[in-house]
């Protein structure tokens, strides 16, 4: 296992991190807890020392099982990363309650890497108003957290704004060879690294879509490469090739995949790809772009939209859905990002057909017409799904408050 250093603290982290959002399941659909614990320990025994979870993963069970997996001396071998969900925070007391509950659930006295989860522009503004920076300072001072950071799928402009707002230790962004100009992108990666922040990477395989069942035209490119690697290895090595990257998270739930990733992480040095390797990856990237429905490059010249549409983000989700029709999560991700579930609504259906974006587009895309296509394909159930999910999040937060009242916990009142 290779390791990279957190610039501000000198902490040494494995370049491969274990993502705890996709635990293996049983035949009946529940989590296979025994197998999950074996897999987590398999990864740790192989050198992984960074594990990433969150309260919402597996409906709250991810943290519980991770806490159990780190018994028998495994806690001392790793760094735990978990997250504060902004959608469950309405005051400073909620911040305190959620963190203390996580410490109890994870069976630990501190969180090594604590993130504000999936920040959008609006959720970040809300958290600032509620005093998030004072909370982070306090939690670091009393030792409950060691490093403060955030994750986000926001665009580059919002990402930079968040980076500049606080003395963060690290951040977590989506990054892979298809997302160089999407969300924070390469520019955001380099900007954060320039601020001496560690950068953790999520979705290096785009939820597994850059591995496994790739389109035939893409597989043909990998098959012709002089070096034989799996699609997953090509994608992981591309991310690790960037020296600004600290940890690459992989949601591993198969023993063979864990072993493959551990093997690759033994030799994936920054700058280690040859020019012919990069050329092969670029051919695959270009073929993916050719297969996409909309030739949006994510340049952002169309932004800001006067109606509030995240035009590049909507196109990115639309293209992903078209490229990987077997992936049932693409519409859910679209709803989560653009349907108003975790921030302000920014969906294609908001488009007023003003045409301002089309005039600014260097690719000369008929954006207003395409927005109709995106809305038609991606938003059919959004009007029902978003209120239901928001109601579920409200109930989860309410239950936490009720439990606190019943148990008489007023330590942070």
Model-derived regions, located:
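N-terminal binding-site loop/beta-alpha segment at the start of enzyme catalytic domains
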Residues: 1-78, 141
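Conserved, mostly hydrophobic/aromatic
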Residues: 6, 18, 43, 51, ...
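Conserved residues at the C-terminal ends of beta-strands
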Residues: 19, 54-57, 114-117, 151, ...
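Glycine/proline-rich, positively charged
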Residues: 27, 31, 87-205, 213-219, ...
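Structural motif
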Residues: 42, 46, 105-106, 166, ...
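Structured C-terminal cap/extension of enzyme domains
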Residues: 49, 68, 187-413
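Short catalytic-loop micro-motif centered on adjacent basic/acidic residues
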Residues: 50-56, 146-150, 172-173, 247-249, ...
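Structural motif corresponding to the early beta-alpha repeats
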Residues: 57, 73-92, 117
């Amino acid at each position: 296992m290779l390791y990279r250093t957190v610039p501000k603290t000198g902490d040494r982290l494995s370049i491969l991190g274990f993502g705890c959002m996709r635990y293996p399941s049983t035949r009946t659909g529940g989590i296979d807890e025994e197998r999950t614990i074996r897999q987590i320990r398999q990864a740790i025994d192989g050198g992984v020392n960074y594990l990433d979870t969150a309260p919402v993963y597996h409906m709250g069970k991810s943290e519980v099982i991770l806490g159990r997996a780190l018994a028998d001396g495994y806690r001392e071998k790793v760094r735990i990363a978990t997250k504060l969900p902004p959608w469950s925070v309405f005051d400073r007391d909620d911040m305190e309650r959620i963190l203390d509950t996580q410490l109890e659930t994870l069976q630990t006295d501190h969180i090594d890497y604590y993130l504000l989860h999936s920040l959008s522009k609006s959720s970040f503004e809300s958290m600032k108003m509620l005093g998030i920076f004072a909370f982070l300072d306090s939690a670091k001072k009393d030792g409950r957290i060691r490093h403060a950071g955030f994750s986000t799928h926001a665009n580059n402009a919002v990402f930079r704004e968040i980076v500049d707002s606080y003395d963060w230790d690290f951040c977590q962004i989506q990054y892979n060879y298809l997302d160089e100009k999407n969300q924070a992108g390469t520019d955001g990666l380099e900007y954060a690294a320039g601020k001496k922040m560690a950068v953790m990477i999520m979705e290096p395989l785009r939820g597994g879509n850059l591995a496994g069942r790739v389109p035939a035209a893409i597989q043909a490119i990998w098959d012709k490469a002089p070096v034989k690697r799996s699609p997953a290895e090509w994608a992981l090595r591309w991310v690790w090739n960037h020296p600004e990257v600290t940890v690459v998270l992989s949601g591993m739930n198969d023993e063979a995949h864990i072993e493959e990733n551990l093997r690759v992480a033994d030799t994936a040095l920054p700058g280690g790809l040859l020019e012919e390797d990069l050329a092969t990856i670029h051919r695959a990237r270009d073929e993916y772009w050719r297969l996409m429905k909309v030739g949006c490059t994510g340049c952002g010249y169309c932004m800001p939209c006067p109606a509030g549409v995240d035009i590049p983000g909507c196109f990115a989700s639309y293209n992903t859905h078209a490229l990987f029709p077997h992936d049932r999560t693409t519409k859910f991700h679209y709803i989560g990002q653009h349907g108003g579930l975790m921030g302000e609504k920014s969906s294609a259906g908001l488009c007023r057909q003003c045409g301002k974006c089309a005039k600014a587009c260097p690719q000369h895309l008929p954006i207003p017409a395409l927005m109709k296509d995106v809305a038609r394909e991606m938003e059919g159930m959004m009007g029902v799904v978003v209120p239901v999910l928001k109601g579920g999040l409200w109930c989860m937060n309410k239950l936490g408050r009720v439990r606190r009242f019943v148990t008489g916990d007023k330590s942070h009142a």
